[in-house]
Amino acid sequence: MDIALGIHFATGFAALTAGTIIMVMKKGHKPHQFLGKIFFMTMIGVVASALFISLTKGNQFLMHMAIFVWYQNYAGWRAIQDKSLKANGLDWAVVFMAAINGVVMVSTFNIVLLVFGALSIFLVLQDINTQLLLRKAKELRKLSWLRKHIGMMVGAYIGTFTAFLVVNINDFEPAWLLWLLPTAVLVPLMRYWTKRYCG
């Protein structure tokens, strides 16, 4: 368990550092791409260790959040790897996992899980709609791959930043507000970047 916690904190710190630098730096050039790879890889460590800890400790909240963040991290990475956005088998498996996870999160009626679960379901429906449009040979929105990349990777970063705040800030009331505050602040920034780079 100590090893898992060590991996979780180390990869979390690395992901948070890389993600924060990406947030403030010029987008799209080589340093961005390099740090983006670091963010993606370290997030794998964050999620894997979180899942191990959640299963060992029986912490369902942590498990649901880990799956939610992994979905965004993976989907944001895939949007860059295959700009056509055509889903393969693994993509569908991740979407299915995110859908089930989202439904379960909403069904808990925990305010934090309810919000993030609803968001997960919304993102899943967007993914399904994209695949339906592709099957009908309809043209996707301009720079759809970049829109998805920005949205999903910022979402994954929000998960990391939120965890950092929750671990390091004590006695914040109401507690659920601290969980949702980074989303409220960073989503408008995400929309700004999407408009700036995608039109």
Can you say where each PLM-predicted feature lies in the sequence?
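Alpha-helical membrane insertion/targeting regions
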Residues: 1-199
